[in-house]
Amino acid sequence: MVNQQWQWQKAPAQPVQPAQPKGFSRTASPVASTLQALRQQGRPAFIGYFPYGFPDVPTSLEAMRVMVKSGVDILEIGLPYSDPVMDGPVIQAASKCAIDNGVKVEGVFDAVRQVQADGARALVMSYWNLILHHGVADFARRMAEAGGSGLVTPDLIVDESGEWIEQSDRYGLDRVYLVSPDSTDARLQLTSRAARGFVYATSRMGVTGERTSMSNSAQNLVARVRHAGAPYVCVGIGVSTAQQASQVGAYADGVIVGSALVHCLLDDEGRPRKDRRKALEALAEICSDLRWGISQARK
């Protein structure tokens, strides 16, 4: 662990607002208000991902609590899906474990409440078919009631988002869409206009996972997305070290880390680690390291 002392202050989480009349959204985006507060502090956000129900529900909730205590500002709570084609092997293994344990979509709202109560923003990251199956309107309502900030939808494009835009506007929820270097300028403009909270920039549309080196494609993409009109752009490109987090944080509004965190609870064969205490200690350590790296991004 990096033996550096750093001080930081979380942006205060906001209580959920009542549903607005159809077609009207709250003026302020929940996540954007946090990103704005952090920008004023001179640092990017630390955005961490963890799948609900992995390796079991109680441990996943404990892991999320550890992440928030160790410096995560915004937590993406993953909904396990049976065909996670855009996820790498680490998150695929974690999702399979959660599904095998019988995790249910309805339980994610308990995780949202906990993360919100612990002082971080809670986003749910989900493949769109899960939301459709649950019911878009009901999911939006329950998400808002739980204090959640919105959804990250990796496989949903703006053109097919009519019902989600309607319901997220009704309940004041954020809409986070993904873009890649392959996205056209017209696509970036359309996405930037429709998104609320931030636009999620990836190194490429496809499988996620940890990387040993960073390319400059994400930095170029961030510049293009800003030019397209997005006020906040956060980057997820397989960051796994404090140095990488600092590099990405120098140009992004938020650094998104997923596989490296989930990996802490998996053994070398892709199975849940038996010693949960040590696994959670490892999670706390890497979160602290990454948080320190992010704190150095603009110094």
Q: Where is each model-derived feature located?
A:
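N-terminal amphipathic alpha-helix/helix-capping segment at the start of soluble metabolic enzymes
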Residues: 2-12, 20-49, 112-113, 298
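Alpha/beta catalytic cores of nucleotide-metabolism and tRNA/nucleoside-modifying enzymes
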Residues: 20-26, 223-231, 240-299
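Active-site-adjacent beta->alpha loops and helix N-cap segments on the catalytic face
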Residues: 26-38, 57, 81-93, 100-113, ...
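Active-site mouth loops of central-metabolism enzymes
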Residues: 46-62, 123-135, 174-183, 211
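Conserved, mostly hydrophobic/aromatic
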Residues: 48, 67, 78, 143, ...
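Catalytic cores of alpha/beta
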Residues: 58-67, 183-193, 235, 239-255
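Glycine-rich phosphate-binding active-site loops on the catalytic face of alpha/beta enzymes
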Residues: 73-82, 148-152, 157, 199-209, ...
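Alpha-helix-loop-beta-strand connector modules within alpha/beta enzyme cores
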Residues: 88-123, 166-180, 216-233, 281-299
